[in-house]
Amino acid sequence: MKISTFFTWFWILYLPFCILFYDRAGFQYIDELMTLGLILFTFIKKTTGHHIKKEIYTYGILMIFYVLYSLVMAINVPASVFLDLQQQVRPYCIFFCTYLLAPTFTKKQQKIILYIYIIAIAYFLLGFRFGVENATIGQACFQCGLLYIFFRGEKKKHLYIGVLIVTMGLLSGKSKFFGEYVMFIGLIFVLKNKLRLDNLLTYIQVGVLITAIVFFTWYKFNAYYVEGFQEEDTSQMMARPATYVTAGTIIFKDYIPFGSGLGTFATNAASVYYSPLYYKYGLSNIWGLTPEWHNFMADAFFPTLAEFGIVGLFFFVWFWVRRYKEINKINIFLIYKIALMCMLALFLEGTADTSYLSGKGMGYFMLLAMALRGSYITKSKNNRILKPNVIKDSENSDINNVSDGNDVNT
């Protein structure tokens, strides 16, 4: 199977079954099977982008170490370690495999993906309960809008259609989506140049963006991150603030330098196999964190870093610093914005959601890898490279370097 064909099917299945109808399908392992399929497909295909393989090997060695470390520490049962392992490696496997394969798509393939996404969203809205918070529609519309602009953003009318798709996500009523929407509008319409760490204007722009995000999400931000931290006794806090405080204790005090290990804290595995750490830190009586009702145990991504400690935190930052440097090398400004939004959306959702580790975050990692590898270059049916279907930065429209890594098997 051609790489472009494989990824066309992957994208077609992704949004309907990993986001929109994931809870209704009655088949909760489709994202794991899709990830496994992508890994196997990567092994049998000729890949490019080999400069990233050292990073892949480093990550593999690191995860093997953490599996052994977790089994030796034995804070939770071995089953929790392996359940958590498959969830922790998923986003990075998706990113690395997509990066190595660097898929390109024909115009027809792009249209098929986008039409199915729009139809799926419309069908989802038929049974949507308006006025009730629903994170699913926000996540689906945001990713669909980004992909639409990624594929079709060469004309302003397509850019505005992409914005309209993202705007539909406001129906979710979720504060974190309001923050993502502010970020999206700011980067699409306000940002005129790449963010440079040595430029004062960058810090002003970032400051204004953060202020706007906090303003539009203040109610929840204040409840969780201002008033939520005012209790001195962790056991008297709400679930999310208590989880963040305890994560800090685990990382910087009690489990230096490698953390508490896989399957022990703030993850689905720690919920399925109720982690003893929740008794140790007095969290087992907090509403949403109890053994009987623990729906808020896997409530945010960043506290999960407690499982990896200071060392894991270092490698997490190292991974994203490398991605940020790669994003800054993208020559086409609109694609630069999309890649940056993928990264920032993962961070924003990570404060109050575990999409980073779930199937719902797979699209961000795929799209980021495609942006970094120049997958926005369109291929015709006879494999002739067409001009990029994006708005070019007037000063940085050279694409000679971004075409490296095209689908050599298509």
Indicate residue ranges for each PLM-predicted region:
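Hydrophobic transmembrane alpha-helices and their immediate junctions
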Residues: 48, 54-56, 304-347, 384, ...
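A membrane-periplasm/extracellular boundary helix in multi-pass inner-membrane enzymes
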Residues: 167-172, 189-232, 249
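Structural signal for the C-terminal ends of transmembrane alpha-helices
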Residues: 40-51, 98-107, 147-155, 186-196, ...
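Flexible juxtamembrane loops connecting transmembrane helices in multi-pass membrane enzymes
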Residues: 28, 214-246, 250-253, 264-273
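Alpha-helical transmembrane segments of multi-pass inner-membrane proteins
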Residues: 91-192
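Transmembrane alpha-helices of multi-pass inner-membrane enzymes
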Residues: 36, 338-392
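Long extracytoplasmic/lumenal interhelical loops at the membrane interface
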Residues: 234-238, 242, 260-308
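N-terminal hydrophobic segments of proteins, predominantly signal-anchor/transmembrane helices
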Residues: 2-25, 33-82, 119-121, 167, ...
